[in-house]
């Protein structure tokens, strides 16, 4: 369970626990002499090697490392299962102190002044227009709107988070910093992003296109070893087994969780998702919103609001589909989602939730009233307006209404934009056995379809470690 505590204000989540309960276990199944009369030998591999030389190159086999061996003997022969289990690197959730930006000393000297900006701006804007007064600090309309929005939800964030944090401290999930300080809380060396998945998607657009009949879902079965890189960028890939699988893409290894599926492509190549014959009961969207910091850092490409608006959500959404969109703290984006984006998709806004980011000791990762960065992000939840006539609805399927103003409190991953899992907090508001889809995903989840041009990013082997024998 990723839900550590569930209280009236919302949920306290354990993101790391959710990842590690996925069962990242590679299995190599060897059978020999399985028939007395017809001896055979076969190998079932859960590790697939894709030729890095060319999208059209021949595949090469690659075995997963051996770890645990379980063998059995009977009259029919002998069988052997070799497994190795992986867990996500725990230090990637080691957030012991609030985030410190460059020029620490200058920021600390200015912090007291910055804390007063939220209250000062009200006095600034109340000055009569006719009274000519030179302002020391000029706020644009977007900043004023953001400050006004913050004052409306501030007490909700503060009070609700405090209750969940106190419960986390009482249970021992969160802990005072002095209790667990050690030398391991220093700098964390992050893996290099050696495989640029978005560039691979861009390259795939210039390859010969497959016709619609060829755009079939590719299932990675136990004896499946004939996968090439072109397949990954043109087909939905499914791992329907109860074990993880490892693939090697452009020389980089990625772990695929059991019962997961994905499409690696950019927004111009979503057709396989539309052709798969599925509609979804929950769609979580984490758009790459335009903003100045993204442009400066060149970390990833962004989409304009109009590009996001043209996404084929109406074709992907089932009746009563729950739509969840992550929104940055820019009021321009929030208003766009509620007033333009959702109406264009025939989606009715039903709730706003907030993801509150805290340290391992329960502090906000940024000061709550910081004028620069807030310790929370917004989620806008909406429901697709009923497509099914009243007479055809299933009276046995009753989905409770989505509550408004709920908090999701968690320690964030230090990896940029690794959002917390929503599987368990959304479960009550989706019909049993519903199909779930994540758009602009950067990782995979069991039971979910995931799409994006970086959909395997956080499945990279460098983010995992193999458990030692006996763990």
Curated annotation (Swiss-Prot):
Major localisation: nucleus
Q: Which GO terms describe its molecular function?
A: nucleic acid binding; RNA methyltransferase activity; site-specific DNA-methyltransferase (adenine-specific) activity; U2 snRNA 2'-O-methyladenosine m6 methyltransferase activity
What keywords is this UniProt entry annotated with? Chromatin regulator, Methyltransferase, Nucleus, S-adenosyl-L-methionine, Transferase
| Top-level taxon of origin | Eukaryota
Q: Does the keyword Transferase apply?
A: yes
Q: Could you give one GO CC term from the UniProt record?
A: mitochondrial matrix
Q: Where in the cell is it found?
A: Nucleus
Q: Which Pfam families match?
A: MT-A70
Catalytic activity reported:
a 2'-O-methyladenosine in U2 snRNA + S-adenosyl-L-methionine = an N(6)-methyl-2'-O-methyladenosine in U2 snRNA + S-adenosyl-L-homocysteine + H(+); a 2'-deoxyadenosine in DNA + S-adenosyl-L-methionine = an N(6)-methyl-2'-deoxyadenosine in DNA + S-adenosyl-L-homocysteine + H(+)
- Give the matching InterPro entries: DNA_methylase_N6_adenine_CS, MT-A70-like
Q: What does this protein do?
A: N(6)-adenine-specific methyltransferase that can methylate both RNAs and DNA. Acts as a N(6)-adenine-specific RNA methyltransferase by catalyzing formation of N6,2'-O-dimethyladenosine (m6A(m)) on internal positions of U2 small nuclear RNA (snRNA): methylates the 6th position of adenine residues with a pre-deposited 2'-O-methylation. Internal m6A(m) methylation of snRNAs regulates RNA splicing. Also able to act as a N(6)-adenine-specific DNA methyltransferase by mediating methylation of DNA on the 6th position of adenine (N(6)-methyladenosine).
UniProt-recorded name of the protein: N(6)-adenine-specific methyltransferase METTL4
């Amino acid at each position: 369970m990723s839900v550590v505590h569930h209280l009236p204000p919302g949920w306290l989540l354990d993101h790391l626990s959710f990842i590690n309960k996925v069962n990242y276990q590679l299995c190599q199944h060897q059978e020999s002499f399985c028939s007395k009369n017809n001896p055979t030998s076969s190998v079932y591999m859960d590790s697939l090697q894709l030729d890095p030389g060319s999208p059209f190159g021949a595949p090469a086999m690659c075995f997963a490392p051996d770890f645990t061996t379980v063998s059995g003997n009977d009259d029919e022969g002998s069988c052997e299962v070799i497994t190795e289990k992986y867990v996500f690197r725990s230090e990637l959730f080691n957030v012991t102190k609030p985030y410190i930006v460059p020029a620490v000393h200058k920021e600390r000297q200015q912090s007291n002044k910055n804390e007063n900006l939220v209250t000062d701006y009200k006095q600034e804007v109340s000055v009569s227009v006719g009274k000519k007064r030179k302002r020391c600090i000029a706020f644009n309309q977007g900043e004023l709107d953001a400050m006004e929005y913050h004052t409306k939800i501030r007490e909700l964030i503060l009070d609700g988070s405090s209750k969940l944090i106190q419960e986390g401290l009482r249970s021992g999930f969160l802990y005072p910093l002095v209790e667990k300080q050690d030398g391991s809380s220093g700098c964390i060396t992050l893996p290099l992003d050696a495989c640029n998945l978005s560039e691979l998607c861009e390259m795939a657009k210039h390859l010969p296109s497959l016709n619609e009949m060829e755009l079939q879902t590719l299932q990675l079965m136990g004896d499946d070893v004939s996968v090439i890189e072109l397949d990954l960028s043109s087909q939905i890939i499914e791992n329907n087994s109860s074990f993880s699988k490892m693939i090697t893409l452009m020389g980089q290894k990625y772990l695929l969780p059991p019962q997961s599926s994905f499409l690696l492509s950019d927004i111009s190549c979503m057709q396989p998702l539309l052709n798969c014959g599925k509609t979804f009961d929950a769609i979580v969207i984490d758009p790459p919103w335009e903003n100045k910091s993204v442009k400066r850092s060149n970390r990833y490409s962004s989409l304009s609001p109009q590009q996001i608006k043209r996404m084929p959500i109406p074709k992907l959404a089932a009746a009563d589909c729950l739509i969840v969109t992550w929104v940055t703290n820019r009021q321009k984006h929030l208003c766009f989602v509620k007033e333009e984006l959702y109406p264009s998709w025939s989606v009715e806004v039903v709730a706003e939730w907030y993801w509150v980011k805290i340290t391992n000791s329960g502090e906000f990762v940024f000061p709550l009233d910081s004028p620069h960065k807030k310790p929370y992000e917004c989620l806008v939840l909406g429901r697709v307006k009923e497509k099914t006539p009243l007479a055809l609805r299933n009276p046995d399927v009753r989905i409770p209404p989505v509550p408004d103003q709920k908090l999701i409190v968690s320690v964030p991953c230090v990896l940029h934009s690794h959002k917390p899992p929503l599987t368990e907090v959304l479960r009550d508001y989706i019909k049993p056995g519903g199909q779930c889809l994540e758009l602009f995903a950067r990782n995979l989840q069991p039971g979910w379809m995931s799409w994006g041009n970086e959909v395997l990013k956080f499945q990279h082997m460098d983010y995992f470690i193999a458990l030692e024998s006996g763990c």
